Amino acid sequence: MAVLEKFIELVKIDSPSDPASPTCPSTAMQLDVANHLERVMKEMGVSNVRQKDGYVYGEIPATPGYEDKTAVGFIAHMDTAPEFNGIGVKPQIIENYDGGDVLLAGSGHILSPKDFPVLLGYKGHTLVTTDGTTLLGSDDKAGIAEILEAAEILLQGEIPHGKICLGFPPDE
């Protein structure tokens, strides 16, 4: 599964945080992401995958001959910001962006290069946006997707490396 597919799968799992909550994770919905990550990591072949209180951990053992190298850790949080609706995310994928206006179909809002000239730098690339009715949740589900993609590549064993530790906490 490509990184984009991993990302889309993750943003469709509701996981807003609640700053008023006395618990951690602050919302039970974050456990849905934790359970998903635990399952995916085990299916990928990540070692020592475990979950406690919504925190998900795993390891990629060092390749032979690199066991004495310093371990590296990658961490990305699974909650999304509570300041805007994060329930029922409907991502839009715009392949080969043409440099024009981007309609957020659910809200009717438009992202225009006139207002956001940085968009022009993405001409010809794939854009992922929200439909405008929710946030997208790329902070930090994009980070999770990238870490999972890197883990999948490293597990193929063609790139030598020391031990790699993965951590996915709830509540930034």
Describe each PLM feature range:
Residues 66-160, 168:
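Active-site metal-coordination/substrate-binding segment of hydrolases
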